[in-house]
């Protein structure tokens, strides 16, 4: 399953960069893909550079472009079913930066 998740992460990231022309999509990095065991659905975790408004606009644009991204997966990945994609904002990078800042500010 991890191999499929990693391949899908690369395919989706490449498709976002090259195939999508929606102006609402900002600077996006696909950080992880979590595919269900039956391969019918996949959660795509993305980080977006910008404020919350830009994040929301990017997530909405990605959700509306899921058909193109699923077509890219169908072309590149040989699996029985192409999973339905759901996009989520990955807060782990933001949390890590916040912890790092707190540690730097800690006078000990």
Q: Language-model segments: what does each one mean?
A:
Residues 1-42, 47-108:
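Charge-rich, low-complexity N-terminal segments
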